[in-house]
UniProtKB/Swiss-Prot annotation:
Keywords: Ribonucleoprotein, Ribosomal protein. It comes from Polaromonas sp. (strain JS666 / ATCC BAA-500). This is Large ribosomal subunit protein uL30. Part of the 50S ribosomal subunit. GO terms for biological process: translation. HAMAP family: Ribosomal_uL30_B (MF_01371_B). The lineage of its organism: Bacteria, Pseudomonadati, Pseudomonadota, Betaproteobacteria, Burkholderiales. One of its GO terms (molecular function) is structural constituent of ribosome. It comes from the Bacteria. Belongs to the universal ribosomal protein uL30 family. GO terms for cellular component: cytosolic large ribosomal subunit.
Length: 60
């Protein structure tokens, strides 16, 4: 049985004033308010979402 790779993401900037698609990406990652943390599976789709909003989040 293999372990799934995980990645933790923290929202460090508010998505207010950003594009609607970027706000939707933040919600899609399970992030709500500033400093909220979400632990997700490390997949190419999740990596792409993190890359899209890299100016709003921090990988921890």
């Amino acid at each position: 049985m293999t372990k799934e790779a995980k990645v933790k993401v923290q929202l460090v900037r508010s998505p207010i004033g950003t594009k609607e698609s970027h706000r939707a990406t933040v919600r899609g990652l399970g992030l709500r308010g500033v400093n909220s943390v979400s632990e997700l599976q490390d997949t190419p789709a999740v990596r792409g979402m993190i890359n899209k909003i890299s100016y709003l989040v921090k990988v921890i």
